[in-house]
Swiss-Prot record:
Top-level taxon of origin: Eukaryota
InterPro entries found in the cross-reference section: PP2C, PP2C_BS, PPM-type-like_dom_sf, PPM-type_phosphatase-like_dom
Residues engaged in binding Mn(2+) 1: 57-58
Name of protein: Probable protein phosphatase 2C 3
SUPFAM superfamilies noted in UniProt: PP2C-like (SSF81606)
Principal EC category: hydrolase
Phylogenetic placement of the source organism: Eukaryota, Sar, Alveolata, Ciliophora, Intramacronucleata
Pfam families xref list: PP2C (PF00481)
EC number: 3.1.3.16
């Protein structure tokens, strides 16, 4: 059986909500893929003046994405730097904490419970792109190729950069760790250089966590929000295959129009976007992935 269904699953699971400073809508669609391996989190007002949103794109199975979806917020809230409002450090430490938990016997057991197939070993991992809004400051932590794009002055202000093995800095680390990059893949296998999970690539006891073939350590980008910032578009890589960032923002803005933004309108914008991106068939290979997007509207 190949990676694709004979007909796409167009049904969407959409969730929306509102906080003090944001309105959000999150929508996911399995699409042409045989299984759904995306996951996401959405927590407006997790504590006073802080909202957190995240997308996790699984590979090699759904289990790591589901594990991170379950544990990320709890671990972030427990983090000492989070409590001290040192959010950049808190995000970095929480990404690394996910791998620490996955390496425990309890974590391995929980992963097994999430798995679609009954095997003892897991070779799964996931990307992670997490946006944290504190008052007028936006932080985006990223490991992998999921993305966050800020709509600023009706143009795209990119809040993350993909981590690909053929990037010079990433490739150098991989080679220092004893690996190689072939056809844009680590050791000819994984087309990401940073991810949560993928523990078989993180097993060299002589190397620190940020020196392994694959690392969970995120880049964190920070920006001060302005009145010209309208919304954040977050998505797994399937959302970004067919349209560029400016085209994606234009599509959302067209749906929003000049109407007051509500949960229902934002949900429609998210769902319409996924419909627009879904390929009519699998011949080209793009528009065929699982798709998850979160739209976070910034109240004025």
């Amino acid at each position: 059986m190949g990676p694709y269904l004979s007909q796409p699953k167009r049904e969407k699971v959409t969730t929306s909500g509102e906080g003090k400073s944001v309105i959000f809508a999150a929508s996911e669609m399995q699409g042409w893929r045989n299984t759904m391996e995306d996951a996401h989190i959405h927590r407006p007002d997790i504590v006073q003046d802080v909202s957190v949103f995240g997308v996790f794109d699984g590979h090699g199975g759904r289990e790591v994405a589901q594990f991170v979806e379950k544990h990320f917020i709890d671990e972030l809230l427990k983090n000492k730097n989070f409590k001290e409002q040192k959010f950049e450090d808190a995000l970095k430490e929480t990404f690394l904490k996910m791998d620490e938990l996955l390496m425990t016997p309890e974590g391995a057991k929980e992963l097994n419970n999430y798995k679609a197939t009954d095997t003892d070993e897991s070779y799964a991992g996931c990307t992670a792109n997490v946006a944290l809004i504190h008052k007028n400051t936006l932080y985006v932590a990223n490991a992998g190729d999921s993305r966050s794009v800020l709509c600023r002055n009706n143009t795209n202000f990119d809040m993350s950069v993909d981590h690909k093995p053929d990037n010079n800095e990433e490739k150098s680390r991989i080679e220092r760790a004893g690996g190689f990059v072939s056809d844009g893949r680590v050791n000819g296998n994984l087309n990401l250089s940073r991810a949560l999970g993928d523990l078989e690539y993180k097993s060299d006891s002589k190397l620190r966590p940020n020196e392994q073939l694959i690392i969970a350590f995120p880049d964190v980008k920070k920006t001060e929000l302005t009145p010209q910032d309208k919304f954040i578009l977050m998505g797994c890589d399937g959302v970004f295959e067919t349209l560029n960032h400016q085209e994606l923002l234009k599509h959302v803005n067209t749906t929003l129009g000049n109407s007051p933004v509500t949960e229902n309108l934002l949900s429609k914008a998210a769902e319409d976007l996924l419909d627009q991106l879904l390929a009519p068939d699998t011949s080209q290979g793009t528009g065929c992935d699982n798709m998850t997007t979160i739209l976070v509207y910034l109240k004025k």
